[in-house]
């Protein structure tokens, strides 16, 4: 079967793309405005031996894309007999509950409309839109979300939407996201189903998770046998061999705040900042950029990037 062709926007370091590639889709175009993210994208694909997208890596702002070039590439893929999909998660800080709530008129918020306009202009066979829970649950942002839905419906799309949590799918993080998917072909839309949940209906939160424990540098704690290890921070520390990773010693060195590094209890994520992970629990939502600091469970420092 011919692989569907994916045009990726707001690609970041490429994790959404990687998910599609793993499921047999072909990412043929990558658009990411932030150069460090795009460099990380290129590097990781090179390491994994994944060929570069045939229409290249594009660091143009989505607001400034040359429509004719994109249209030509979309048509080329369709003429090759391929289904074409647009995927993207526009920057979310303006809709985030923990952010500044500038909404659709914010510098980042307006890019959601730009992406939806792009979908309506180029009419891919399907599209995916991803954003934070605040776009779905906050009244003024929800009105904007519903307006975007009406626009893609008028363009001929049948829609599926769902507020999902990453932990439902086995990721060790409590991370809500609204997913909107649209299909031009109604027959194709009827085949779509929300599947793949490892822990559906909130079952991941029903285990007897630890809450907080006294912080102890390099302390040892055993996991309760009733807790699934794959949903725990420590499991992934060990699986990814973070202690021997190239960045293992490269952590943020604070000029102030060391006392808090030494006193916040393991698992105490009750504050907006200085949240200490618990080794035998999933992570709270990672939302860096809102002055968040996530502390290592049993070391006097922040976590490193592995």
Language-model-derived ranges and their functions:
Residues 87, 179-183, 287:
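Short, well-ordered beta-strand micro-motif
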Residues 233-306:
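C-terminal target-recognition/interaction regions appended to catalytic cores
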Residues 108-183:
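Conserved Class I SAM-dependent methyltransferase catalytic core
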Residues 83, 175-177, 281-283:
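Extracellular structured ligand-interaction cores
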Residues 17-18, 93-97, 135-138, 170-174, ...:
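Short catalytic/ligand-binding loop motif for oxyanion handling, primarily in non-cytosolic enzymes
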Residues 171-239:
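Flexible, glycine-/basic-rich loop-and-beta segments that form/coincide
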Residues 2-123, 133-146:
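Core alpha/beta nucleotide-donor-binding catalytic domains of modification enzymes
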Residues 73-78, 166-168, 271-274:
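Short, P/G- and charge-enriched loop/turn segments at secondary-structure junctions
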């Amino acid at each position: 079967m011919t692989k569907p062709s994916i045009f990726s926007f707001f690609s970041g370091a490429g994790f959404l793309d990687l998910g599609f590639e793993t499921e047999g889709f072909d990412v043929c175009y990558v658009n990411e405005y932030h150069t460090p993210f795009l460099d990380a994208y290129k590097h990781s694909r090179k390491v994994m031996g994944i060929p570069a997208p045939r229409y290249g890596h594009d660091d143009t702002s989505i607001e400034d894309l040359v429509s004719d070039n994109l249209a030509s590439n979309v048509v080329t893929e369709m003429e090759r007999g391929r289904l074409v999909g647009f995927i993207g998660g526009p920057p979310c800080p303006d809709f985030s509950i923990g952010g500044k709530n500038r909404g659709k008129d914010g510098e980042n918020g307006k890019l959601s409309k730009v992406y939806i306009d792009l979908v309506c202009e180029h009419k891919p066979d399907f599209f995916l839109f991803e954003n934070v829970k605040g776009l779905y649950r906050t009244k003024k942002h929800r009105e904007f979300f519903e307006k975007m839905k009406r626009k893609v419906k008028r363009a001929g799309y049948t829609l599926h939407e769902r507020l999902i949590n990453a932990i439902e799918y086995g990721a060790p993080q409590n991370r809500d996201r609204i997913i909107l998917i649209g299909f031009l072909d109604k027959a194709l839309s009827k085949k779509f189903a929300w599947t793949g949940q490892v822990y559906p209906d909130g079952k991941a939160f029903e285990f007897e998770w630890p809450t907080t424990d006294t912080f102890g540098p390099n302390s040892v704690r055993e996991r309760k046998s009733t807790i699934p290890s794959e949903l725990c921070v420590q499991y992934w520390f060990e699986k990814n061999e973070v202690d021997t990773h190239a960045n293992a010693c490269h952590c943020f060195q604070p000029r102030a705040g060391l006392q808090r590094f030494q006193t916040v209890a393991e698992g105490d994520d009750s504050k907006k900042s200085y949240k200490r992970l618990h080794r035998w629990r999933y992570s709270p939502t990672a939302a860096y950029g809102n002055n968040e600091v996530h502390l290592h469970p049993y070391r006097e420092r922040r976590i490193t990037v592995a």
